[in-house]
Amino acid sequence: MNLMMHDVRYQNMTLKNADTLEMDWPDGVDEHGVDHPHSFDMVVANPPYSARWDNNDNKLKDPRFKEYGALAPKTKADYAFLLHGLYHLKQDGTMAIVLPHGVLFRGAKEAQIRKALLEKNQIDAIIGLPANLFYSTGIPTVVLVLKKNKESKDVLFIDASKNFEKGKNQNVLRKEDIDKIIDTYKERKDVDKYAHLASFDEIKENDFNLNIPRYVDTFEPEPEVDLRQVSKELHDVNAQIRDNEQELVGMLKQLTSKDDEVMEGINDIIKNLEGEIK
């Protein structure tokens, strides 16, 4: 349905309902145990985030995963989906996958896979998106752009998390937001508070942690406070409060009641207010 909504003719579709990670259709090993993967010029994926999967040790023999030395955790299949798509990417192709930010910095096995991807020079860019873009989740997500045949070992970081239009139920990337991401990706240059081209050595110094704030500084300094102006405003506010209290006392003194208890209460309020005014 998603393909049809984006004007892909059904004659150009090949659909299969199966467990992607369990059955690498239409591929598989031949009678000699050799795998013949079907490769694509482009791979685009938005898999279920942090899904569970069967990461038994036999998966380490799977050609999709074995070159990375570790398997994605049982309760977080994010890197399993990533490696599946990357395996089917042509040598000169480009892959883009949407995942939660956790894949950028989580440790243990995921850190091992992330390090291997960087050492193999397969991560091309990391693009942080705004929160609440998708119907299924409100969490902020990230686009990882991957290639198998990069010319340089740097990685472009883009923080596009603040560039969006707030809708009634979800946020929307405007045309200018998308154009800015694309132009920045093509230019591969630093943009103040938006993008940074990090060298492999810089990433290595950060222990292969790809958390975007480590590379793109979006900090906005607080404006300087004019203490004299603040003091004057505070004095003016206090003066206004005193005027209002005096006006209230005058109004209360005009009140009368045959009920002695009510009048006693009013007089107590007047006494307290006059004490504060002094």
Residue ranges of model-derived segments:
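A conserved structural/catalytic subdomain of Rossmann-like adenosyl-cofactor enzymes
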Residues: T20-M23, D27-K278
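Short, conserved SAM-binding/catalytic segment
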Residues: M1-Y10
